[in-house]
């Protein structure tokens, strides 16, 4: 199956999908990490988030990979299966050895959101391990395509599903 690139950056241009079944693969959508949505710092409930001992969880997106292929004989549906690489660190305020990390993948055309999947990735921390590298997915997204509109017309916007306070803190940290 065709693979697309795994790259760490704020914007991840897709090099394209490889060939499959002797045919040229259809162009894949471009995955994009939004800088303000690629980091998650979750604090103990009820804390103001000013002290390191209040940190429950830290997440950082590190990579995206996947594949795309036409799913029907008409060639008007493109299946894109996406995996997201994430580093997750357990903070001193996490009361258990596991956590659910909220993520999303949105299909956009320009600035218009056409589809969005929100899901949780369950993360277990082995005994005496504070940081784990995990992969979410594959998450399937089906996109309509035509001879005039390929998968390259779309973007896959990928990020943590943040609360308004978490998003504001990320934007402040980034100077936005």
Placement of each model-derived feature along the sequence:
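Helix-rich interaction surfaces within compact, conserved domain-sized segments
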Residues: 25-26, 114-176
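N-terminal intrinsically disordered, cationic/polar leader segments
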Residues: 23-24, 63
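Bacterial signal peptide processing site
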Residues: 18-22
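Bacterial N-terminal signal peptides that target proteins for export
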Residues: 1-5
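Mid-length scaffold segments of soluble, non-membrane domains
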Residues: 72-116
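Post-signal peptide N-terminal segment of mature Sec-exported envelope proteins
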Residues: 24-48
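C-terminal motif of bacterial Sec signal peptides marking the signal peptidase cleavage site
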Residues: 12-16
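Low-complexity, acidic Ser/Thr/Pro/Gly-rich terminal tails and inter-domain linkers that flank the onset
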Residues: 50-75
